[in-house]
């Protein structure tokens, strides 16, 4: 005959349920609300997606690249995700992949013709996709090769575009982290503002909203 005592929870079930509820509401909901409130107060732009506005309208985010069809604009790096934030990804193609090599060769020829430079002068960043496919930045060299084309398309002296390019160049964070870089969307907005005082209405920025 069994002499074991009957099972008793002594409130263990209620305690477990209360703990689970506290973790769910206190940490899952409460922590998120507090963190969101703090970041919104201290860094409102970053907390809301680092959005860029023109003429009172959101035209993009400084964190996400977007394409520009008009010759008056600087072009970002190519994107395997077609610049879709919901499909961020690289091509995952090996360096020896024939499709990758063919695509790079085609892009090199197209960019050289578009920007009026020698094929060997095309920077690698304009030929290759970033890991996310959404890199919003170019190096100064990647923008510099496009300067002549942008200036000619706008009918501006090259020095005018060069000054805006220089002003848009971001230095390494704290002088140590990263490399000098240029946010392509921010630079293109600066071009519009300098052009006619109506930012975001040029063909390209407006079309990519």
From Swiss-Prot:
Q: Which residues form a coiled coil?
A: none
Q: Name one GO molecular function term.
A: ATP binding
Q: Which GO terms describe its cellular component?
A: plasma membrane
- GO biological process terms, semicolon-separated: potassium ion transmembrane transport
Segments crossing the lipid bilayer: 18-38
One Pfam family recorded for the sequence = KdpC
The listed locations are: Cell inner membrane
Q: Which domain of life is it from?
A: Bacteria
- Keywords, alphabetical: ATP-binding, Cell inner membrane, Cell membrane, Ion transport, Membrane, Nucleotide-binding, Potassium, Potassium transport, Transmembrane, Transmembrane helix, Transport
Q: How does it sit in the membrane?
A: Single-pass membrane protein
Briefly state the protein's biological role.
Answer: Part of the high-affinity ATP-driven potassium transport (or Kdp) system, which catalyzes the hydrolysis of ATP coupled with the electrogenic transport of potassium into the cytoplasm. This subunit acts as a catalytic chaperone that increases the ATP-binding affinity of the ATP-hydrolyzing subunit KdpB by the formation of a transient KdpB/KdpC/ATP ternary complex.
Which PANTHER family does the entry link to?
POTASSIUM-TRANSPORTING ATPASE C CHAIN (PTHR30042), POTASSIUM-TRANSPORTING ATPASE KDPC SUBUNIT (PTHR30042:SF2)
Describe the family membership recorded for this protein in Swiss-Prot or TrEMBL.
Belongs to the KdpC family.
Subunit structure, as described in the record: The system is composed of three essential subunits: KdpA, KdpB and KdpC.
Q: What is this protein called?
A: Potassium-transporting ATPase KdpC subunit
Please give the organism: Xanthomonas campestris pv. campestris (strain ATCC 33913 / DSM 3586 / NCPPB 528 / LMG 568 / P 25)
Q: Which gene encodes it?
A: kdpC
């Amino acid at each position: 005959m069994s002499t074991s005592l009957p099972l008793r929870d002594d409130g263990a079930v209620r305690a477990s349920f209360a703990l689970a509820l506290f973790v769910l509401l206190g940490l899952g909901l409460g922590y998120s609300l507090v963190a969101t409130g703090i970041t919104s107060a201290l860094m409102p732009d970053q907390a809301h997606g680092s959005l860029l506005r023109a003429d009172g309208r959101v035209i993009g985010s400084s964190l996400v690249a977007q394409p520009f069809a008009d010759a008056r604009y600087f072009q970002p790096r190519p994107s395997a995700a077609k610049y879709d934030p919901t499909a961020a990804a690289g091509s995952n193609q090996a360096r020896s992949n024939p499709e990758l090599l063919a695509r790079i060769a085609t892009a090199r020829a197209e960019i050289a013709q578009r920007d009026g430079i020698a094929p060997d002068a095309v920077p690698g960043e304009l030929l290759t996709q970033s890991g996310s496919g959404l890199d919003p930045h170019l190096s100064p060299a990647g923008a510099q090769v496009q300067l002549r084309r942008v200036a000619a398309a706008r009918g501006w002296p090259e020095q005018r575009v060069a000054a805006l390019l220089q002003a848009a160049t971001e230095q390494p964070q704290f002088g140590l982290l990263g490399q000098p870089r240029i946010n392509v969307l921010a630079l293109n907005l600066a071009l519009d503002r300098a052009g006619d005082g109506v930012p975001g209405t040029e063909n390209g920025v407006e079309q990519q909203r």
